[in-house]
């Protein structure tokens, strides 16, 4: 591996922040990969919950966009992007919509915690630009995602999922499908 040439635009950008951004990029890509796995699982012919598949595919795209936004920031600040291997999802069989939503909730909380730690690092290193970036583009969105997933988990449980097979079908159709006829 060759060493990156020094940046002429770098200013008030600590090496620890640069390294943390690279770790966050990896975590966002991992989240995208997990959501893609979930989407493909629900699209299988023996699962056939198309709106769960669409929902998780949308989440996958969103997480990839988060990673790309961080990459753009890294370049704007004069940092260097060092991509690492993306860890494989912990499972291939997501078992049920409820289980997948619970895993997604846990994942979003992990991503949020990592962002909070990145924000603390930026604060400690006196980097107001990075603090503003995280606050503007990530923190509110994370809280909304966590709330939405928590609501989905609650509603699936109230409906009797996963024991009541009809519950996930109805949730797929009326909540994730917004009542679509198909």
Curated annotation (Swiss-Prot):
> What are the alphabetically sorted keywords of the record?
Acetylation, Cytoplasm, Cytoplasmic vesicle, Iron, Iron storage, Lysosome, Metal-binding, Oxidoreductase
Q: What is its EC number?
A: 1.16.3.1
What Gene Ontology molecular function terms does this protein carry?
A: ferric iron binding; ferroxidase activity; identical protein binding; iron ion binding
Carrying N-acetylthreonine, the residues are 2
Spell out the Pfam families in the cross-references. Answer: Ferritin
Cite a single GO BP annotation: intracellular iron ion homeostasis
In this chain, where does the modification N-acetylmethionine occur?
Answer: 1
- What InterPro entries does the entry give? Ferritin, Ferritin-like, Ferritin-like_diiron, Ferritin-like_SF, Ferritin_CS, Ferritin_DPS_dom
Role according to the record: Stores iron in a soluble, non-toxic, readily available form. Important for iron homeostasis. Has ferroxidase activity. Iron is taken up in the ferrous form and deposited as ferric hydroxides after oxidation. Also plays a role in delivery of iron to cells. Mediates iron uptake in capsule cells of the developing kidney. Degraded to release iron upon autophagy activation by nutrient starvation.
Q: What does the subunit comment say?
A: Oligomer of 24 subunits. There are two types of subunits: L (light) chain and H (heavy) chain. The major chain can be light or heavy, depending on the species and tissue type. The functional molecule forms a roughly spherical shell with a diameter of 12 nm and contains a central cavity into which the insoluble mineral iron core is deposited. Interacts with NCOA4; NCOA4 promotes targeting of the iron-binding ferritin complex to autolysosomes following starvation or iron depletion.
Record-given protein name: Ferritin heavy chain
- Source species: Mus musculus
């Amino acid at each position: 591996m060759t060493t990156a040439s020094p940046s002429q635009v770098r200013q008030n950008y600590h090496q620890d922040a640069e390294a943390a951004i690279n770790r966050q990029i990896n975590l966002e890509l991992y989240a995208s990969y997990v959501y893609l796995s979930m989407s493909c699982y629900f699209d299988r012919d023996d699962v056939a919950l198309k709106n769960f598949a669409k929902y998780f595919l949308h989440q996958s795209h969103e997480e990839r966009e988060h990673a790309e936004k961080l990459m753009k920031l890294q370049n704007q600040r004069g940092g260097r992007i060092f991509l690492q291997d993306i860890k494989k999802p912990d499972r291939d069989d997501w078992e049920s919509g409820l289980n997948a939503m619970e895993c997604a909730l846990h994942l979003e909380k992990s991503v949020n915690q990592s962002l909070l730690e990145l924000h603390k690092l930026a604060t400690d290193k006196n980097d107001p630009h990075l603090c503003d970036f995280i606050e503007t583009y990530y923190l509110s969105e994370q809280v909304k995602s966590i709330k939405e997933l928590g609501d989905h988990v609650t509603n699936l449980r109230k409906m009797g999922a996963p024991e009541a097979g009809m519950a996930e079908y109805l949730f797929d159709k009326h909540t994730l499908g917004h009542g679509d006829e198909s």
